[in-house]
């Protein structure tokens, strides 16, 4: 807990916010994966969804189940992405645009999608101009990069995943209190923690609740695991923690259904 005390002390002194906005944006996105006709498998579980996974990550957590994916891919112009959405037709009935208009969620994930937030904002603005609507958009965020004011109106749900020491990354890289506090002030913001031991709740309290960074009612606990076996192994510990502390539980439904298959 000594490292935890040092982190909290640093937050009281005003931890430095990391700036990832120096890269010039363009009319393209660096994309690692695009797939549709699936469901949101964690946090906001169960909604039909199309996933747009952007390249790159600021952390590279030890338990990440997508690091082999977000390191791959390439640059796509907005026009190419729109064409893909208009043509992509898994069920051979409706394309992605019509499904999004009908209520399917667009989940923007990574890696760290806010690494490209300037280009992402331009993409969403052009989407709105082209199709005359904005879908229900969920976006993943590690609470390291603060979103721009201009991006906020486009996002219906912030799926935040602040970290714990179990990510096995140096703590100063993932504990940015000013960003966490800003995200907690958004009404559509939830905080998902990955759990693999009973000690994890003590860390959540020490790092996030006692300093007043987030609200307990917006906490979601999810078992660690990138295979069905690992998720089941950690589920009971996580559920017991949820019951004991009166917070929400999220499974990893895509892992439960399809194990470690990608693109689902």
List each model region and its residues.
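Conserved Radical SAM active-site core
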Residues: 2-24, 29-39, 48-49, 55-157
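Conserved AdoMet/S-adenosylmethionine-binding subsite of the radical SAM
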Residues: 114-264
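A short catalytic or substrate-binding loop motif that flags glycine-/basic-rich loops and adjacent residues
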Residues: 43-45
